[in-house]
């Protein structure tokens, strides 16, 4: 997530890379890698290998000052340590002076899908209606701290996690969205290659000038 944000903030254009009007060896890509290495000095030594649960637990247990994470972590954080809610704020990923739009956000969604050939169409539709009705969506917002999908839903912000309003205020300024970089490339192999390149930079195994050009055939 951090590497993807840094690339986007530097103005990396995945569509341009895909049609070969831009390249991973361009200055903005290398600079994103350099900033990733700079930031790596502020993380715990185990950061590259920690699971999502380990990283989140380190935050809500007070072992880490900051967590780079999506709003989906709100319920996990508050559920495991309710006393932590009053200490936990939210801010958007910072911009880079003179670079790309700082109000672009990584946005992911929860999706309910039904097979067109299911033998239980009525039951599947009923389940989707249950998950998307006002009662379920109020629970999603007021307990889970996640964005409801029902337009103009009345949310009791005294009941909802405090972090929900922080995130909504940030998203109100969003000018565009993008996905995780490893999921946005041409293939699963390319996504894995991107992850591996960024991990090598983060750990100091290779410099950005070494790690990225080594993998351009796959990326």
Spans of model-derived segments:
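Alpha-to-beta junction loops
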Residues: 61-70, 86
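Extracytoplasmic/periplasmic substrate-recognition and gating elements
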Residues: 41, 80-145, 196
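Short helix-initiation/N-cap motifs at beta->coil->alpha
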Residues: 46-61
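Pocket-flanking alpha-helical
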Residues: 54-57, 74-80
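Glycine-centered hinge/linker elements that transmit conformational signals in sensory
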Residues: 18-48
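C-terminal capping/gating helix-and-loop segments adjacent to ligand/active sites or protein-protein/ligand interfaces
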Residues: 148-152, 166-218
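Extracytoplasmic/periplasmic solute-binding protein
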Residues: 1-22, 64
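Beta->alpha turn/N-cap motifs
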Residues: 52, 69-74, 110
């Amino acid at each position: 997530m951090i590497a993807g944000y840094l690339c986007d903030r530097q103005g990396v254009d995945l569509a341009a890379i895909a049609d070969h009007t831009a390249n991973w060896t361009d200055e903005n890509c290398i600079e994103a890698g350099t900033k990733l290495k700079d930031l790596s000095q502020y993380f715990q030594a185990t950061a590259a290998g920690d699971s999502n649960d380990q990283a989140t637990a380190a935050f809500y247990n007070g072992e880490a000052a900051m967590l780079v994470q999506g709003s989906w972590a709100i319920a996990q954080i508050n559920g495991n340590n309710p006393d932590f809610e009053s200490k936990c704020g939210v801010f958007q990923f910072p911009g880079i002076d003179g670079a790309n739009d700082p109000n672009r956000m990584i946005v992911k969604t929860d999706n309910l899908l039904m097979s067109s050939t299911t033998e239980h169409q009525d039951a599947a539709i009923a389940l989707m209606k249950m998950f998307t009705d006002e009662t379920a969506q109020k629970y999603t917002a007021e307990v889970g701290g996640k964005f409801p999908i029902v337009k103009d839903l009345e949310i009791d912000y005294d009941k909802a996690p405090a972090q929900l309003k922080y995130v909504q205020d940030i998203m109100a300024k969003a000018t565009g969205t993008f996905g995780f970089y490893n999921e946005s490339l041409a293939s699963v192999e390319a996504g894995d290659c991107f992850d591996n390149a960024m991990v090598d930079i983060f750990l100091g195994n290779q410099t950005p000038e070494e790690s990225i050009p080594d993998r351009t055939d796959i990326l």
